[in-house]
C-alpha cells in the first residue's frame, strides 16, 4: 500500500481569533493518535496538557508533550482531540479517523468519508 495523505484543517477551538491551518497529513490506521510538529502547536497556541510516553516505529521510547484541544476538519466531518508533539509532519491516527468516520482508499491513495454514511458520521456503540 503506498503512503496515503489527505488535506485537513487544524484549529484551536479555545482560540477562535487564530486562523485554522490547512495541512497535508499522513493518514495511518496503524498509528493511534494525532501527532503534529512543534511549529504547528506554536502556530495554534496549543497548551501542554501533560507528557506522554510514546513508542516510535524503531521501538525506542520517549516522552513528548500532549497538547490540546485540537479541532480536526475534513470535508463535512470534524472531531476534537489532543495531539502529541513530535515529528516533522502531521500524522493522523486511527482515533481521529474513526471519530470522523473516515476510510482509507489504498487503490486511490486517498482519504474519504465513509461512503456508507456520506452525510453524518457513524459510530459503533456496542
Regions found by a protein language model. Give the residues of each.
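Pepsin/retropepsin-fold aspartyl endopeptidases
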Residues: 1-126
Amino acid at each position: 500500500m503506498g503512503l496515503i495523505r489527505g488535506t485537513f484543517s487544524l484549529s484551536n477551538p479555545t482560540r477562535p481569533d487564530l486562523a485554522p491551518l490547512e495541512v497535508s497529513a499522513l493518514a495511518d490506521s496503524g498509528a493511534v493518535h494525532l501527532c503534529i510538529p512543534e511549529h504547528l502547536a506554536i502556530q495554534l497556541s496549543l497548551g501542554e496538557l501533560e507528557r506522554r510516553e510514546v513508542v516510535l516505529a524503531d521501538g525506542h521510547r520517549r516522552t513528548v508533550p500532549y497538547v490540546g484541544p485540537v479541532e480536526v476538519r475534513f470535508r463535512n466531518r470534524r472531531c476534537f482531540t489532543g495531539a502529541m508533539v513530535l515529528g516533522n509532519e502531521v500524522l493522523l491516527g486511527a482515533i481521529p479517523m474513526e471519530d470522523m468516520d473516515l476510510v482509507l482508499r489504498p487503490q486511490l491513495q486517498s482519504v474519504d468519508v465513509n461512503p456508507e454514511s456520506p452525510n453524518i458520521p457513524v459510530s459503533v456503540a456496542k
